[in-house]
């Protein structure tokens, strides 16, 4: 399991490819270690197996986000979504590795709990997205525009706009259309032209 950085990737994504490479290397080492030390009993240790599955799933989601960003032409408006997705996935992957280290038994487990956790704290895979990053990614999908349609492409959008999700999306569209008027009113209030 390795993550190679493709040639000519966007400079904003290089660090994510590098961190995913570290993550994949760590995952490969820990899987081999588990197969060697735990062997057939790995199935019995369901929680440990679940942590391995969590780490792999979060790495897969991060690489999928990177691949989609590249495939769709590196659109600048998608960058906040990509950064949020990768930071979140890498933080969750790190959380899974911490769980693996803490629950590995025997003398090897003791080494992993000390050196492994120290290594993860010195050279973390990721931290949860900052509030600024969360706000930027949320802002990108708060308009019912082409980007929203592209990001949600392939998802079920009901035709009937009278109830449920269809009604909610209609309200979302109307709110987006009313945004310029709201901005004018807010500007007039700031200039004290309106109460």
Where are these regions (language model features)?
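Flavin-dependent oxidoreductase catalytic core characteristic
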Residues: 1-195
């Amino acid at each position: 399991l390795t993550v190679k950085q493709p040639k000519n990737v966007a400079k904003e994504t290089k660090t994510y490819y590098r961190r995913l490479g570290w993550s994949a290397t760590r995952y490969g080492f820990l899987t081999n270690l588990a197969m060697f030390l735990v062997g057939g009993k790995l199935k019995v240790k369901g929680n440990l197996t679940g942590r391995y599955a969590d780490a792999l799933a979060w790495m897969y989601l991060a690489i999928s986000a990177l691949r989609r960003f590249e495939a769709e032409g590196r659109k600048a408006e998608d960058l906040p979504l990509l950064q949020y997705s990768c930071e979140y996935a890498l933080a969750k992957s790190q959380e899974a590795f911490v769980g693996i280290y803490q629950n590995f038994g025997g003398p090897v487990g003791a080494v992993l709990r000390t050196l492994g956790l120290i290594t993860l704290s010195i050279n973390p895979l990721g931290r949860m997205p900052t509030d600024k990053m969360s706000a930027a990614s949320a802002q990108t999908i708060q308009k019912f525009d082409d980007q929203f349609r592209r990001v949600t492409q392939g998802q079920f959008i009901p035709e009937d706009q009278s109830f449920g999700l269809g009604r909610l999306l209609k309200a979302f569209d109307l709110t987006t259309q009313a945004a310029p008027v709201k901005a004018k009113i807010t500007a007039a209030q700031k200039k004290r032209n309106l109460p």
